[in-house]
Amino acid sequence: MADPASYKPARQDIPTNPGVYRFRDEHGRVIYVGKAKNLRNRVSSYFAPLHQLAPKTRAMVTTAAAVQWTVVGSEFESLQLEYTWIKEFAPRFNIAYRDDKSYPYLAVTMSEDVPRAMVTRGEKKPGNRYFGPYSQAWAIRDTLDALLRVFPVRTCTTGVYQRAERSGRPCLLGYIDKCSAPCVGNISQEEHRELADDLCRFMAGHAKPYIRELTRQMNEAAECMDFETAAARRDDVGALERVFERNTVVLTDSTDADFFAIAEDELEAAVQVFHVRGGRIRGQRGWITEKVEDVTTAQLMTNLLQQVYGEAQSGLAPAASGRRRTARHGSEDVVGQHRRTSELAYRQDTIPRAVHVSVLPDEADEIRAWLSELRGSQVTVQRPQRGDKAQLLETVAENARQALTLHKSRRAGDLTTRSASLQQLQEALGLPDALMRIECYDISHVQGTNVVASMVVFEDGLPRKSEYRKFSITGDAARDDTASMYDVIHRRFSRHVEQQRRAAEKGVSTGEVAADDDEGTTRAFAYPPNLVIVDGGPPQVAAAQRALDDLRVTDVHVVGLAKRLEEVWVPDDEFPVILPRASEGLFLMQRVRDEAHRFAITFHRQKRSKAMTVSALDEVPGLGPAKQKALLKHFGSVKKLRAATAEQILEVKGFGPALAVKVAQALGGEAAASSTAPAVDTGTGELLD
């Protein structure tokens, strides 16, 4: 019995998007497939204490050895993908469909003289139209019941229909207007078929014309004082609007395409492929690859297509083009013809008519020609810009981004990998001591305004977020990046030097000194790092080293990590240190640098937004610093304050109606204030109805 804790993912690594998840056993077999509106909440629920889980769930999580997930664009997409995977893998713990029944569909038997609408499972018959699948039979029955208000097609069995024909009396649905009763001649078979066609068009996504027509009839009836008819048409419109759900996973019936997307950073790339056949997702594949050289995304896409479709070429001759060959003796060998037919079917199933990519390959024309030759017919390679295909491609891209994020998190969290990365970095930089603490600094601004800096801390290769710090940079230090870097490093390590002095006076070690300032930051700054990483090249490194020299700090080493080429710069060295692109040491440095950049960008955006808000508030007459502070304290954030209405601002102590309207106008414009705020009598300050 496996311990679920052995494969439990970190909660922050699980996306909050809707999606489908799979549990696999130790042999890699899928044992359970499920869907969720919020993957993080749903997947995390399986890792509660075992005694809190249901017996079936407890058995499943102790049998499993891994959990994976796929992000989709909506809950409806997750339903479709869940269905596909359950049919493909037949998981042992998905007992709802253990009888191998298909998910229920809404079928319209257009192959019959008098089409019938019904809920069906299993094999599909030629000539009929099918819509779905649905997760539950009751859901599609509710849908059909609502649709019969507008499209009263036959739903009875053949036996019931023939009995009604003989007796001349319709069934109950005919009496309550949920069937047009073609069995007794209330409507002709041709008119009934038109009703069935309308139902099929509605279910295929063409709902707006019917809703517009019913709305027009409702308005006309209301104008003629026929309120009973108007109410009936109103209910019809409501029924259609409730049942109409558009699905972007299931494309048109004729769609055969593969969707490729790549997410990458400087060192690695994640690839995701969705295979769509007959308008439905048949399969999904994903890879993580190391970028052993400096390649573009277009080159990565070219290599990817060559690898994926090269599998179809193995063991098969290129498809013949032009005139078909004549056999040696004037007749084709039956076995050979069957083999060629099978090969062609294999090619056309493996290589679809269309290949949709997130970025065009750098040899697009050659790739198209190669794929067309392999398939035996024209293949298009394109990047969709709009519509369902573009939406599905974005879903594939989101999966690639999530896969790369998860891979990096798992790689960073592995103890052996962390130890190797720290040792590699120590050896590459020639440092005497083990890297117990690393600090990284990044500067962020927009054209020299609202200049800020971030400090992130990694201890034993893991982020120590409680010791992250933010710096606001003003005055002469904000003139350029090197001056800003000098200022930040000097401010940070001047506290370290001061802490050492106090410790020496008290006769205690630095680690025993408690916080003694209002912000409680002295203790954090008391611990010096073994290594300081700055985001930048030689100028930034020189500025940081100059700050340490001015403070006479000699036990801290400084390096810079330059973007794009990922070069590591050491002070006073003419050439950079080049770490292998696949090394764990470079991966750690990149992760630390990216975290500092993220933290700096976040702080810069907050400061810029607050500055814009305070600037707008300064222009409001009668709004001084105390009331500005009260506003920010009440709403908790600048974002919430900007979204507040005048009525909500009235709840703040000391704000009257007139002042609340002025604040709302200053932050959201006159339209926002007038649309949400009540009218105010400026003479009395009273609210007007």
Swiss-Prot record:
Primary residence: cytoplasm
Q: From which organism does this entry originate?
A: Kocuria rhizophila (strain ATCC 9341 / DSM 348 / NBRC 103217 / DC2201)
Keywords on record? Cytoplasm, DNA damage, DNA excision, DNA repair, Excision nuclease, SOS response
Q: What is the lineage of its organism?
A: Bacteria, Bacillati, Actinomycetota, Actinomycetes, Micrococcales
| Protein name, per record | UvrABC system protein C
Disulfide pairings? none
The record's annotation in PANTHER family points to: UVRABC SYSTEM PROTEIN C, UVRC/OXIDOREDUCTASE
Please give one Pfam family short name.
UvrC_RNaseH_dom
Where would you find this protein in the cell? Answer: Cytoplasm
